[in-house]
Curated annotation (Swiss-Prot):
The keyword Cell membrane applies. GO terms for molecular function: protein disulfide isomerase activity; protein heterodimerization activity. The gene is P4HB. This is Protein disulfide-isomerase. A motif (Prevents secretion from ER) lies at residues 506-509. The modification N6-succinyllysine is found at residues 224, 273. It is a peripheral membrane protein. Belongs to the protein disulfide isomerase family. Its EC number is 5.3.4.1. The active site is at 55 (nucleophile), 58 (nucleophile), 399 (nucleophile), 402 (nucleophile). The modification Phosphoserine is found at residues 333, 359, 429. It comes from Cricetulus griseus (Chinese hamster). NCBIfam families: ER_PDI_fam (TIGR01130), pdi_dom (TIGR01126). The record marks 463 as: Lowers pKa of C-terminal Cys of second active site. Transmembrane segments: none annotated.
Amino acid sequence: MLSRSLLCLALAWVARVGADAPEEEDNVLVLKKSNFAEALAAHNYLLVEFYAPWCGHCKALAPEYAKAAAKLKAEGSEIRLAKVDATEESDLAQQYGVRGYPTIKFFKNGDTASPKEYTAGREADDIVNWLKKRTGPAATTLSDTAAAETLIDSSEVAVIGFFKDVESDSAKQFLLAAEAVDDIPFGITSNSGVFSKYQLDKDGVVLFKKFDEGRNNFEGEVTKEKLLDFIKHNQLPLVIEFTEQTAPKIFGGEIKTHILLFLPKSVSDYDGKLGNFKKAAEGFKGKILFIFIDSDHTDNQRILEFFGLKKEECPAVRLITLEEEMTKYKPESDELTAEKITEFCHRFLEGKIKPHLMSQELPEDWDKQPVKVLVGKNFEEVAFDEKKNVFVEFYAPWCGHCKQLAPIWDKLGETYKDHENIIIAKMDSTANEVEAVKVHSFPTLKFFPATADRTVIDYNGERTLDGFKKFLESGGQDGAGDDDDVDLEEALEPDMEEDDDQKAVKDEL
């Protein structure tokens, strides 16, 4: 009787464990609150993606994430990849501070207190390389040519240090550089056969890549800083296509000056124009990042809007700086020859190009409604009128937060339409830019009081009719603060806006 009871108990336990055991989809563990702790206990290294089924970024990531999972599994790695539907598992999402989709966190040895945020690229190689850096040595020891070949073949970019004495000062500097780079595999070797295969007869560092010239040999004194600079200059293609997968490399890189070629892949002289762009890029490695954008692709239409371009105006070139202040520049010539692009880049670096400020034409009825319409051409005259207090919403037509605000802003306009010195206005910041105001987020609300000193006050109070009225009646004091909402860098990323009914969570990279 006892043995039968024990058997039933054991079977019940097995059934319960089986019910909670994570399922797999394309080699990715599917986790829920009921099996999350079990998965952490079973796997020392676990990368978890918190996603939403409707999220465009998550859909784009899915095949690369699965490819990375399959690659690690095939290698017999301890590392596993998992995913959590955060819209279903809200408790887990809240526990791990999920604010946007996808959010990806790395759990090591079951530590739930401080999982590492995944910040590298969205391609399978990026994911695998980042994980291997987190779980193994900074550089793999390459004992023979087969090991070197495997490392080079494993990724789009790989770096190998050739040192006859791997304990030398130069080798130590190389390892420090390897520790500082997340998304590129590093190898180190003292094997004479490996030296011979890659045509080295003395110590050196080589960056191998599956594009452009194929390899770059480091020259000069081997220091961590110089190696990192060398890698920065050579790890990306001369021209990189802007996609969902490459966006993190573009925005996450150290080069903050980007020149963009908007070119439809369907155009007859596509190869020639891209070739001219690539030829110009050769002279600006490490200084300006050359980016190609397929202007026909649906996901890229918002980027065209951001630069004030229409599909029929492409091919076209624009330059942007992503420092503290985002600034755009337009070539004086529409010619897309290598010579003209090179000249434009040189003139920019020499400080001889003025920023390009977009403006729509002024509508005839711009001041006929309670909310006045501002464009670049009339902004200065209206906003800095010394006799008027002007409250302006800087918006983007596609922004969900702006759409929510619209009816409230219209009511505010109605409230003050007959006021003698308060003006409520709005400006589409995707089509209009002004030198006096840098818009970093949507919507941005700024107050221009009736003074002669061109004062500008940020509003960051409640976005309610009462909140706005208190702010205006207090002379711009009650609710003043820094602007904070959808970052403009997101506007440059493809497929940023999801359906309106998904407005509860910001879609972040």
